[in-house]
Amino acid sequence: MSKNNYNKKTPWLTITIVVVVVLGIGYLIVKSSPKNTNSTAAVDNMHGSPGAPNTAQLDALVGQPLPSIQLADKDEKTYTSVDFKGKYTVLFFNEGLMCYPACWNQMASFGSDERFNSDQIQAISVVTDSAREWQTAIAKMPQLAKATTLFDTDAGASRQLGMLTTNSSMHRGSLPGHTYVVVDKDGIVRYVFDDPNMAMANDMLFNKIQELNK
């Protein structure tokens, strides 16, 4: 290559390098900007769920009569708060179909645990799916058929009890997460427990009921 040709190409090479460097710096600035960082965090946090968790409404239930709610069984028979009187009742509000396997395992466990299917204690799982939709879960996990399940298809009861703003809700404002409400024989809420870890709670809940029943 002649010296003359080399000198002609050098400015263009320099310009190209400068443009690449400028574009790279610009990308890094945009990527690290607070607005972009916050947007990314918002997507990662709570699977895009709006609003911060708030359990005040749920916690306020303790010591009060269970609010008047309506739930339906697979045959569309309606159940209200009055129907839960007469024995200790554990209401397990959860995400249903979308919460596999954690919620399903808990529901199936309640169904097979004699302690929660007696004349003293009953466990009722509440999902926001329809009864027809829930049949797909039973087909996949037949053990779920033993669980007593009621349906809150419009999430009305879940909203009324404060289930949609808990820490465990992965779709905050729309669906419950993994929350328990213990109601005594007189229909008074004695204990609430929201579990973001979605662990099995049979033993803990049974012991809590024994403690409350002393």
Kindly give the residue locations of the regions a language model identified.
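Structural microenvironment flanking redox-active thiols in thiol-disulfide oxidoreductases
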Residues: P101-R159
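Hydrophobic beta-strand positions
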Residues: Q70-L71, V182
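Structural micro-motif
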Residues: A145-T148, M163-S169, G173-V181
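N-terminal targeting signals for export/organelle localization
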Residues: M1-P65, K214
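Short active-site neighborhood of thiol/selenol oxidoreductases, capturing the structured segment around
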Residues: Y79-F110
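Thiol-/selenol-based redox modules, centered on thioredoxin-like
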Residues: R172-K214
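Residue-level recognition of short loop/turn positions
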Residues: D75-K77, D186
